Amino acid sequence: GSNQDQIKEAPVTIALFTDTDLAKRARKIARVAGVRNFSDEQLQFYMQNLPAEFARYNDQQKSDYLALNAGLVAMNLVLALTDQGIGSNIILGFDKSKVNEVLEIDERFRPELLITVGYTDEKLEPSYRLPVDEIIEKR
């Protein structure tokens, strides 16, 4: 069915957002992770250098960074769901311009993708993938 049908029929739909304020996000991650994992010196390094690094990103670099991170999160989530016997489907084709308003989420957060989640009685078959030798070239 269509993406809209999947969303309507799924018991759960996850909307995955990225935080477009990379500097603020980096500081928060450094603070939270730093308490457990970083020396004071390391924490200071991350608090000063990561925000400055992100500030140098142009719009395309920022968009690529956010999309890549969203993809990694989605992949891990889908693998964890699959491991628990729960079906899921990643949806990229949706009207991103309305999601923040409908869900009342600050515009700072960018909708990246939706994941429909649920159990199914159908025997799931893997979707077609190109053969490895068509996508990887050994040199």
Which residues does each PLM region occupy?
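Acidic, surface-exposed loops and disordered segments
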Residues: 1-139
